[in-house]
A protein has these predicted regions:
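Extended, charge-rich alpha-helical interface modules
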Residues: 1-122
Length: 122
């Protein structure tokens, strides 16, 4: 089955798969990751060099690190100030990620544009 999604969503997915290729060592998982990565990159090769893609790669790498640190805190049952800061960093960083994806969709003329709406916390 195939489904249409925005260009920003595809580039976001490709950037996450690129991170997984570098972080995950399990050979069975890597087979699936590489298959999905290669399939998506074949469909959108010219977009990988875009500056916004590099921004997504950077922000998704940051999210990966935040989530890893959060899970370690959870594992150790350390729900301290740093845990709270990291938990908040997840949604602050995801908000930035959403802005990048929308910019990609608008700049590249995506037919689909994802919209987000959250309570203003500023």
């Amino acid at each position: 089955m195939k489904i249409e999604v925005s260009i920003g969503e595809i580039l976001d997915k490709i950037s996450i798969l690129e991170i997984k290729k570098n972080k995950i060592k399990d050979k069975e998982k890597l087979k699936n990751i590489n298959n999905e990565f290669n399939t998506l990159v074949e469909s959108y090769p010219s977009y990988i060099d875009q500056l916004e893609y590099k921004d997504l790669l950077k922000i998704n790498s940051l999210l990966w690190d935040i989530e890893d640190r959060l899970r370690l805190k959870e594992k150790n049952k350390k729900f301290d100030e740093e845990f709270i800061r990291l938990a908040r960093d997840v949604y602050f960083t995801n908000d930035k990620r959403s802005v990048i994806k929308k910019k990609i969709n608008i700049r590249l003329g995506s037919d689909l544009i994802e919209e987000k709406s959250y309570e203003d916390y500023s």
